[in-house]
Amino acid sequence: MGEEAGVNGTGPAEGGGDEGEEDEQKQVIQRTTKFLEYDADQHEIEVEMGFEDPSNPPVPGFNLYYMQWRTRRFVEHFVVRLLTAILIVVDMIILFVDLFNPHVKNDPLEYCSLAFSTYFMIEVILRIFGLGPKVFFRAWHNALDCFLVVFTFILSVVTVCLENMPSNPVSLVVALRLVRLVRITRILWERRHLQRGARQFVSQNKRRYQQHGFDLDLTYVMPRVIAMSFPSTGRMSMYRNDIKEVARFMDTQHPGHYRLYNLCSERHYDETLFHGRVERFHIDDHNVPPLTDMLRFSASVQEWMKQDESNIIAVHCKGGKGRTGTMICVFLIDLGVFQDAEHCLGFFGDRRTDKNVANKFQGVETPSQSRYVGYYEKVVVAGRQLPLEIPMIITKITLHGMSTVGAGDGSELRFTLQSRAHTIPFQAHLGMQKNCKVMVERSVGLVHVFLLNAPIIRGDTRIMFFTDSRKIPCGYEKSPFFFWFHTGFITDNILRLERHELDNPHKSKTWNVFQEDFAITVHFETDSMTRAY
């Protein structure tokens, strides 16, 4: 397989490797570094070598491109699309009521219909301006929609004028109402507009690719690296990327030169739509990949990139943020583009975020994922040598800043402890003191948990706390807080994680409970025994 070959044959740590291959690697790094001039303070890149990022948002200001973009964002907003759909339905009802009711001079329903026609006319004009006439009229349904709106608007104006004539021809007015019924057909393709609005609403302020008739939650992180959300089918395609549109994009923009990386453990799709050019890495949502998978991923990408300078990769999880950003940062660190993981994570977040829409950061937010990118930086520095999976036993867990967490004594909490190599987790309950003994220091907000019958852990390990208390907020995994770590990176048999380094308490919405002094300290002792649990 290409993945294994990549692991064994592409790393610069191979010592006496082929000089030509090393030169090629250096050229790739030089080209990439030349493309990026990264400002660590401003978190911006300068585009060089003639590359224009098609997913790059326009520069704010009084310019045509920005005004078109703003107009498009407004007219395709989910609320505007929903309002338009409702007005189409109301307009249909008014047309039927007006048609079957006896003719009345100066009928107020005619004026309502004219008001709706005016709204539809303005809405179509805004869509033409936002998309641009060339792109708008390329789609047959847009052209037909425009014709119907303009045609029925003229009919509405004529009908109102005839209503105000001293001797209005009733039969002609009725005929015009009948003709206006063709506007009902607009409801058929309004579904498309609602889907587009829903996708923009769900993607929030992630950069979208909105060129060449596409509107996808898809970002060029680099010229040959794409981050995107899941290519979806069925109901999910109504608010995420439609898999057929993603396939059309790949086949038209990068024909024969793309490879997809699916990082979702929870869902997959028909690979034949992408001609079988899909590799899969199973990573649970909001969790971290094994360090071995990080190495395999980077080696696979490098092997694919070397085959042809036109080859690109498209990486996705569900939303195209956490797992996607983690693995893309792994590849960028391997290239040597960034000196450290922190700058690499900041770069990905800036590339994925459209600040014209909002300032919400759309990068890797989960602390454990960021921690593992930092681990990978250390692996690369060590010549791609994975750390030893040192057997360890957790002797004590200390919870800091517990005064504002539930009852303050940890009695509402329980937790699981599990290394990746084991399927059955170790469980402990603080309130029942199951597999643990608890000592509380209320005056300083400390809860000490001494583990009993603790198992030996090795390598990737997760500690996840749970609670049934409504006073303690839960987030991902229905857990108030959890975290991943690797035993090979534990120093001095102690691991301390502050609030911002814990998954879920890092979010500001939990800070009324998990205050600034909230932290966890884990105490270990090394054990060379090989018993498992």
Per-region residue spans from a language model:
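Structural motif corresponding to the C-terminal cap of alpha-helices
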Residues: V75, V97-F100, F129-P133, V157-C161, ...
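Voltage-sensing domain
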Residues: Y111-W189
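Cysteine-based protein phosphatase catalytic domain of the PTP/DSP
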Residues: L194-I313, L335-G363, K396-Y533
